[in-house]
Amino acid sequence: MYDIDEIYYDAIDLLKAMVAVPSFSREEKAVADVVEQAMTKFGLCPKRYANNVWCQSQDFCPDKPTILLNAHIDTVKVAEGWQHSPFAATEEDDAIYGLGTNDDGASVVSLMAAFRALTTMPQPYNLVFLASAEEEVSGKNGGEAGLPMLPPIHFALVGEPTNMQPAIAEKG
């Protein structure tokens, strides 16, 4: 079983750590290091290609379908008009402000939390969690570059801020 409070506070701490590290597209090494270290701390077995970091359920079985949980770790450059420091992870009124908290750090930590909780018990499917790079620029070393290293994926859930409106999309 798992401790939901522990997973919750770990997610908050990880989000703050991610915000504190500039992670502009094609410059994600430091934040990929943060995510990889967190995975290791949480008892996961991270793998890495460039700045893409992933792990899979420890009871992975090739006979079961595989679900991918994916969110990106890169951000756009800092624009003008910030009311809080973009790298300070400021907590105010039950919210955390900082560059990348919404797009897409909250998805990264939420999907990693779901992965951690779901992999503590037997499932009829495999899980893979991927924190991908270069999404903001559709870069050649982003998630697409890491996909060939993953097991065959049958279904993917991609975290991206859509104002709570489900979206279906593909490129190509």
Each predicted region: which residue ranges?
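N-terminal helical capping/dimerization or prosegment-like subdomains
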Residues: M1-N70, T75-V78
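A generic local structural motif
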Residues: D5, K41-F42, V53-Q56, H84, ...
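A generic structural signal for short coil/turn motifs at secondary-structure boundaries
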Residues: R26, L99-G100, P166-A167
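Short, contiguous, pocket-lining structural segments
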Residues: V31, D103, E170
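Fold-independent oxyanion-binding glycine-rich loops
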Residues: Y49-N51, A71-I73, T101, S132-E134, ...
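Active-site metal-coordination/substrate-binding segment of hydrolases
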Residues: K64-V128
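Fold-level recognition of mixed alpha/beta catalytic cores in primary-metabolism enzymes, strongest
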Residues: A106-A113, T119-G172
